[in-house]
Each structure stands twice: as C-alpha cells, then as structure tokens.
C-alpha cells in the first residue's frame, strides 16, 4: 500500500546524508516523510511548527493518520518508543488512553546498530497497523525492582503476547516501548544510502 513511497524516502535520505553524518530522526524524519508523501501523491498536512496532535504527526489528503517513529531492528523484531504516559496515573488510565487510537499507521524509520557500527547507512521503513497493537486487551503485569534504589518498588508494567511485547518504564516518564515481530508488520523496506 505504501511501497510507492520508498523511492522518494530513499531520495530524501540521500539528501539528508549529503548534509548530515548522523541518522535521520525525529523532526527530520517527519519532514522527509512529508515530502515523500507529497511526491507519491498521498499529500501531507505536516508543517514545521511543532504543533501536531497527540499521537499524530501528519495526515494524508485522504485522511490517513500517521505517527512517525524511530526504531531499532534487532534480529526479527523492531523496538519502537511510544507515548509518555505520566499524566495518566493508573495502569488502567494508561491503557484506556492507549486504546483510543489517534493514528492509523506507525511509519517507523528504523536502523540496526550493527549496520551503522560497520559504516553502512541502512534504514528500514517499517509500517505498523496501529489497530494491531491492542495494548488494552493484553494481560499487564507489574515490574518490581530487584536491586539498588528501585529494589522492591514498582518500576513499571509489561505485557507479552504472540506478536508483540510492550513495557511502560516509570524511570522514563512512564514511556511506552513496544517490540514488534517483523512478520507482524504491514510492510518492511530496506533502504541503503550510498
């Protein structure tokens, strides 16, 4: 469905690396995807005003809501950082918030540290259907610290299901981290920048 974006993303990443040696992340990824969406005919409402809605970084002309994320590929999985959930006090509040999907798809521009440590600029454009991440329907367990200052204290929550696992880390502003099996993703495109 989104494979037509790949040549345009590749072109934008090449331009990014003509200017920068570091990876394309955050607002750079948002802007580069915006241009790719427009060039591929999807359109985008993204603007460089840091004023997008919660969970949605840009919306196409046909109303597809996209959350841009970075990620790390490890073996057959991708690890994606998500929302900070501090303002939602209980685990039930956090899961209720997560159940109200603001985005339709997560467009993840992931890297594998092994590629980059060898000097290879390889990205993975990964599309995840947000509906498949049904956090609120999973069995969450408390994580209790085992040593140091967090010993015997609540350090967060986690869930494990067939196609993904997730954790909420109190030490990181209750940030959500999701590890998704690559074969559960809608699309995966390798992009090598030379």
Predicted regions and their residues:
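Nucleic-acid endonuclease domains
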Residues: 1-64, 68-194
